[in-house]
Each structure stands twice: as C-alpha cells, then as structure tokens.
Amino acid sequence: MAVTALYVHVPFCAQKCRYCDFDSRSFASCDLDAALDSYFEQLYARLDAFGKAGALDQIRTVYVGGGTPSLAGERLVELARRIRAWCAPVEFTCEANPESMTAELAAALAKVGVTRVSLGVQTLDNAELTAIGRIHDADRALSAIATVKNAGLDVSCDLMCGLPGQTAASWKRTLDGVLTAAPHHVSVYPLTLEEGTPLYRMACRDESLEPDEDFQAACMDVARELLGAAGYHPYEVASYALDGHECAHNIAYWTGRGYLGLGRSAAGMLDAEDFDRLAGLFPGVSPRGDAYRVRLVQRDDDATAFEVEHLSQREAAAEDLMLACRMTRGVASDLLVRAARVIPADELAAACDRALELGLATWVPETLGVHEGPFTSADVVAGHVRARLAPTHLGWLDGNVLFELFWDLA
C-alpha cells in the first residue's frame, strides 16, 4: 500500500454551520489571526517532519479541507508552497467557502500549484442557506465558481438535499443554476442531523426540520438525471464529474491506498511496512503488533496525541470491499479473489449473492466482447470468471445496506 495521498485539516470557520459536527472552530475576528498563525506554524513544522522522514516522496494527491481553509488567506498559499517543496502531486485540492474565495486568493493558489478548489455551495436558495447557517448568498456562490474558473483552476461544488424548507422546485433551480455556472465536478449529499449540532436540537423541537428520506432520494434521482444529461458522469456514490475531472484524492480513499493526515482531526492509513518505517512520526503510539494496517487520527494541534485503530488482514479486506462499493465501477474481480485469501470464500460469495438478491448490485463482465455464460458468485470469488460487482440504481440509493453486507465480513 503506497502512501500516495495527503490530507491536511484546517479547523477554522467564520461561523460554524448549524448541521456541522466536523472539528472546526469559529473565533471573533480579533482572535482569528493569532489562532491561525499559531496553528499554521504547527502545520509547517509537522510537514517538515513528514518530508524529512521521506513520508511524502510518493504523494500524488493533496487535499486541504476543513473547516474553511480559504479563511486562512495568504497562510493557505504559503502552506501549498511548502507542500510543493516536498512533493509533486498531480492533483492539489483546497476547500473554500464562497464568502472567502477572492480573485486574488484563487490566482495565488494557482501560482503555487494548487489545481482544484472545492466550493461549499450547498444550495442556491437564500432562505435555505440562512436556515442552515451559511453566511454567503446564491449570487456570491455563483461568483465564486466563476472566480475559480477564471484563475484556471478546476472547481467542484458541494450541494445538499433535504434542507429545511427545500422543495422539488427549489432543488431543481439550484441544479439548473449550478449547471449554468458549469463547474468541473459536483458532489451531492443528503443532509443528516448529527446529535449535538444546532440543527439537531432545532429538529427535536420542530419535526418539520427533519430530512425526509423519500424526498432526499427523489432529489438524488433528479440530480443524477440533470447532471447526466449535462455530461457529468457518476463515478462515486455522491460525486459527478466531466470526463477527466474526477477527484483522484477521493478515489485513493475508496481504492485502499495509503494516506497521511496532517493537522488536528486528520486521519491517516498506513500498512504494516509504512507504519514501521514512519512510526517515529507518531509519538506515544504503541507498536502495531500483528496488525495489517494502522489508522491514526491526530487529536491535538501539535501532534502529540493520536487515536489509533489496528486492522487485521481480514478487517482490511472487508473495508476494501465496502469502500469499493462506493465506486460506480464496484468491486473488481481481482479484489474479490484477494479478499478470499483471508475471508472464507463461501462467506464472501454469500455476501455477493445477498447483494444480488436485494437488487443492490449486479455482475458486469470485465472482459469486453467475452461472453462468460452462466456463472455464480462462487465462480468469481474463485477466480474462474472475471466480473465486477457493480452497484445498481437501488444500491446507489441505499448504499448503507450494500456497504454493511461487506463490512460484516470483517
């Protein structure tokens, strides 16, 4: 498992959204600069430690998320420059919110090698934006898309369905408006109410604020139809892209590649060999024992505390199968054959059969022009037939059931 992806977390926001349970902090403007300066100095030091240890040598994708990284302004530009000094990623994404994405920042990011900006648009209905605590309006969101494109950067838009007050008509207007702005990539997420968030507490008092799952499914269907008609193909459960503009960083997550996390709440995943090689970067973390993979989450600003999860080879195989189900291509036959080395073949074939019975997945031959004839899941798992297990439309809408079938094999 080569370490090919780097995630950097910037946990600062001008105002925390009502639905958000991510690690992010909002400050009065008088305190924000000092907090950002302190945090970024710690990021720089940690980055240098990674670089000197050779941890960044094979990095191909970088993703700076948050929080609101664009709130950091010139500090974000300097961070990107320093990352580029240690590695040469082919894709470099920074998240941004419309209110803090200026033409000057977009141009500066492009100059230091950022290739892509992911904008938190969410909706183009101003009443819906207010309901979820966003501080930009629809015009500012559309302006930000144009600003990023004018700087020569790819732009992705995040959208949400099931928002308070959202209707089928307002959802279609949002999709139409985004398509007119023509980003390169669109992600569509159903709103979930996380316990402890302001919106969760509001919904406890007013049930009308709770997302309607049937409405969300209808919204996802409309999005798939309109985005598909406009040339965006669904390559992952929540994401659509124009050809050649898929998010390589997210694909690295879903295809079992190693990744590093930098910053508070950032997660990394290392195989046994890479963990042993880089263990000195994680003070206080005990040896892995016989773990096949190690997942680490930084729990403080200065990288002295980590949450650690050890995965056995069987757990890692089950996770790879589950994550592959997020991709439109589904689970490749090679992955199934490898998984059968550590998961009993009859259990693995039974999980595939159950996905077929529930209408969540279908077999798709991997060799064009070759008609395999009748075959069973056991044939694929044994390597006698080359076919991938691809999610159906129902599997796409009801992905959690499909994911659980394979994670339960751990």
Please provide the spans of the model-predicted regions.
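C-terminal scaffold of the Radical SAM
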Residues: 2-5, 24-53, 58-342
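Short, amphipathic alpha-helical interaction segments positioned at domain boundaries
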Residues: 393-410
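Short amphipathic alpha-helical interaction segments
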Residues: 342-357
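A short, conserved structural fragment
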Residues: 356-382
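Local cysteine-cluster metal-coordination motifs and their immediate loop/turn environment
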Residues: 11-24
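Short solvent-exposed loop/turn micro-motifs enriched in small/polar/acidic residues
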Residues: 244-246, 354, 382
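Short active-site neighborhood of thiol/selenol oxidoreductases, capturing the structured segment around
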Residues: 6-10
